[in-house]
Amino acid sequence: MARAQNAWQKDYWKNRERPVEKKNSNLQKFIKYIPVLAAGILAVCISFGIYRSIQESAMDGYQVVLLGDSIMGKERCDKRVDGVIQETTGMSVYNGAFGGTCASAGNPQNSYDYHEESLNLCRLVDAICEKDFGVQLADLPNNQFQSWYFPEALENLSKVDFNKVDVVLLEHGNNDYSGGRPLDNQNDPYDIYTFGGALRYSIRELQEHYPDLKIILVTPNFCWIDDSEPCNVQDFGQGTMDEYVDLKLQIAEEFGLDVIDVYHEIGFDETNILSYTEDGIHLNESGREIYGTFVGEKLLECMEK
């Protein structure tokens, strides 16, 4: 009986030990793979770091930055304006243009509640010069004009080192015109609530903070907005498009800047504008090809001066 009991106890404790052995075996296997797991995690971290480094290097490497509205910024896919300019010039181009924006500031009474305000040229130039896009990034979720490309375009623009940029193109004007923004203030030439004042202010700030940066103005393109007359006839409260264009040309002369005169020279007018745009203002694929090629060729001419 004692022998049987001893045998039973032996089997009992042997069986009790098996799970421990199994646990120890699993633990040993896990320990064995720790170096592999650690190496994998390290590789991912390094890869992510390299990717971020490449991204940041890419942001540093742009020769040309476009600042404008939907004429330059709306399309980010086929035959995009910046892509055509890049192909034409061989220069690296970053598209920092945002649809729906003006050169001038608006709504001075409630500027902190007007979330679209911070992407207008004069406000964006403040961010570029101060190297602080906090306001723009905070406003973006509530921006009623924002398109799908805004978040990435703004995030990447905030990483561009303008000390390494050769040229910036300032293209705004269509929305100042169609929105009836005041043309100019004779008593204050740097009044940012006017089209002319905002342009002068933006040019002055960029020149002061980035003295080696070449600034080129680009006049708005001809347009024919729905249910209105062509832009050389239609006045939305502050003048026809011709007046906004003439003022931009005048400001280029004031500052001794080169200007790419799309309005007068590209060949868009009331007889063909609907062939080159989706709606009388926003360029279609054919229009973007012509526009980007024209701007690129004129840019090369400006760089040779």
Can you annotate each of these PLM segments?
Residues Q63-L67, S92-A97, D166-H172, K214-T219, ...:
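Structural recognition of the beta-strand scaffold that forms the well-ordered cores
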Residues G73-N185, P189:
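Conserved SGNH/GDSL esterase-like catalytic core that processes O-acyl groups on lipids
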Residues S111-Y112, P220-K305:
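Catalytic His-Asp segment of secreted/periplasmic serine-dependent ester chemistry enzymes
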Residues L169-L183, I203-D242:
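Active-site segments of SGNH/GDSL-like serine hydrolases
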Residues N185-T194, D235-F236, H282:
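The substrate-binding groove and active-site-proximal loops of carbohydrate-active enzymes
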Residues T194-G197, Y201-E205, E243-Q250:
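Alpha-helical scaffolding segments of alpha/beta enzyme cores, especially the outer helices
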